[in-house]
Curated annotation (Swiss-Prot):
Signal peptide: none annotated. This is Alpha-amylase 4. Binds 3 Ca(2+) ions per subunit. The lineage of its organism: Eukaryota, Viridiplantae, Streptophyta, Embryophyta, Tracheophyta. The keyword Hydrolase applies. It comes from Capsicum chinense. Its cofactor is Ca(2+).
Length: 9
């Protein structure tokens, strides 16, 4: 739902 640093969340 939101890419922080790896591409997840």
């Amino acid at each position: 739902t939101d890419v922080g640093f790896d591409g997840w969340r």
